Each structure stands twice: as C-alpha cells, then as structure tokens.
C-alpha cells in the first residue's frame, strides 16, 4: 500500500511486491526474509553512500551486500523473531501452519546471526535489548514511536470490557480462548471482542456466551471509538516478545487496563 506520509517526508519512495509460493518455503533462508526481496533492490540501495535502516529482521535480505558496499547498517528489531514464531507454532491449531511456524522459528534462529554484521541494533523492547547487546553489540533501546504526545483517556465509566487485536494471528486468538475459558464465561458484564479476521472457531466460542459480542474487521474510526468507550481493556498475552502496541494505545486513549506478566 502506498504511504502518503512517507512520500511527504522522503525524496524517493520505492515499493516492492511481497513474493509468495512454496519454493520460498523450501529455502534455507526464512520465508519472511526470502519473500521480501526484489531484483531492483541492489540498484536502489547500493547506488549511493547513505546509511541503511532495516525495519525488522524480515527486511534484511540485502544486509550483507550493503555491508560489503561499506554502507553503515542499522537494524530495528521488532522482537526476538525465532522465539515469537515458536510461540506462534504452540498457539496454532492448523497442522500445516503449525509446521510452518516451527520450521520458520528454526530458520530464524540460524539466520539471526546476520545481525552481527550490522553497525547498530535498535531494539524496540527494553527487556530484549540485553539479548541483542550480548550477541550482536552494540544494541540500543529506542522505544516504539506512536501518535500520542499525552494521555487523553476519557473520564467516567464505560459500558463494556474490550479485548482487541489482530485475531488472525494465532497468539491473539489463543489469548481470547484462554480468557473465555477462565474469565469471560464466569462473568455477565458485556464483553466486546474486536479485531481483524476472527477465525470461525473463535466466532463459535464467543457465541456460547450471550454477553460476548464479536466485531470483525472494524475500521480505524470504529476501533478508536471502541478503545475510548471501553471501561476495562483485557490485555492478556502468553508471550513476552517485542512490545505490545495495543497496550500503548489503550494506556494513552482508554480507561483501565488489565494486563499480565507472561
């Protein structure tokens, strides 16, 4: 998707198609890396002496070539990827997807060593900075950037509990399932579950409790209203990798948050 904000700030913006197919799954390089490359990348990245910032390990297919071209290289790490994919494999119900996530985790653990060639690692999570600094120094902690400059949560009380996230991600769907079995089925307070592409089994499970409502694929304005009007945000997770941007959103724009320490 073209980004108007980037185009306002940058001299040039190049867009590359995301590749797909079984042949990329069979490669030694992780699928999330090998499908994010293009024949035009060398021409665009190596034609000058400017530094290169790779946004996430998955974007680093050109890292080694940039290093050989004596360009300064920085990598913004979103999380410890192989741990994240391991947790996805544990949460996944579909057998093929479970195998994919497990194999991807192993490939990512091997591939991660490419970070040793970078000049700097810029970690998004304070609790993961030590991991990267010990293995691929130097690593710096730079917090997540977001649109908020002050806390602007509403006063008073809301009418429901809110659980939200990308529900197509196994980790998030599994978190709802855990909450439904241990908490939501024992209360009668209205609960709204909102997020992208909820799987059919999640809709069936939510339908067992009359006080639970699922709002699939809300647009940005609808999601913003749901966050602001909720009384309590249920922010449960089974893994501690990376940073939870939805927690930052709820803290700045919502009311009360119930969180856990994985």
Residues covered by each model-derived region:
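A short, charged, and often flexible helix/loop element on the N-terminal side
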Residues: 11-42, 93-101
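Membrane-proximal helix-turn-helix segments that form the acceptor-binding/catalytic region
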Residues: 39-46, 80-84, 92-121
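Short N-terminal targeting/anchoring amphipathic segment
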Residues: 43-61, 74
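Active-site proximal beta-strand in glycosyltransferases
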Residues: 69-91
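Donor nucleotide-sugar binding/catalytic pocket of nucleotide-sugar-dependent glycosyltransferases
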Residues: 101-151
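Conserved catalytic-core segment of nucleotide-activated headgroup transferases in glycan assembly
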Residues: 141-208, 212-228
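Acidic donor-binding loop of glycosyltransferase active sites
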Residues: 227-242, 253-256
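Short hydrophobic beta-strand element within catalytic cores of glycosyltransferases
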Residues: 246-249, 256-261
């Amino acid at each position: 998707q073209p980004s108007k904000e980037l185009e306002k700030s940058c001299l040039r913006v190049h867009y590359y198609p995301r590749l797909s197919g079984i042949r990329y799954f069979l490669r030694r390089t992780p699928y999330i890396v090998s499908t994010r490359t293009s024949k035009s990348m060398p021409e665009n990245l190596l034609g000058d002496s400017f530094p290169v910032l790779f946004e996430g390990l998955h974007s680093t297919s050109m890292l080694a070539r940039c290093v050989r071209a004596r360009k300064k290289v920085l990598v913004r790490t979103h999380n410890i990827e192989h741990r994240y994919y391991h947790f996805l494999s544990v949460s996944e119900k579909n057998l093929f997807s479970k195998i994919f996530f497990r194999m991807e985790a192993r490939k990512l653990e091997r591939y991660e060593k490419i970070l040793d060639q970078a000049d700097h690692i810029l970690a998004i999570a304070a609790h993961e900075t030590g991991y990267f600094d010990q293995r691929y120094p130097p690593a710096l902690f730079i917090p997540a950037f977001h649109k908020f400059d002050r806390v602007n949560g509403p006063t008073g009380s809301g009418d429901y509990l809110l659980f939200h996230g990308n529900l197509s991600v196994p980790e998030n769907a599994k978190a709802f399932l855990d909450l439904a079995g241990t908490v939501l089925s024992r209360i009668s307070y209205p609960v709204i579950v909102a997020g992208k592409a909820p799987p059919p089994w999640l809709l069936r499970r939510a339908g067992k409790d009359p006080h639970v409502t699922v709002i699939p694929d809300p647009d940005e304005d609808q999601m913003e209203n749901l966050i602001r009007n909720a009384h309590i945000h249920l922010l449960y997770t089974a893994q501690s990798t990376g940073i939870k941007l939805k927690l930052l959103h709820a803290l700045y724009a919502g009311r009360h948050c119930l969180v856990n320490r994985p």
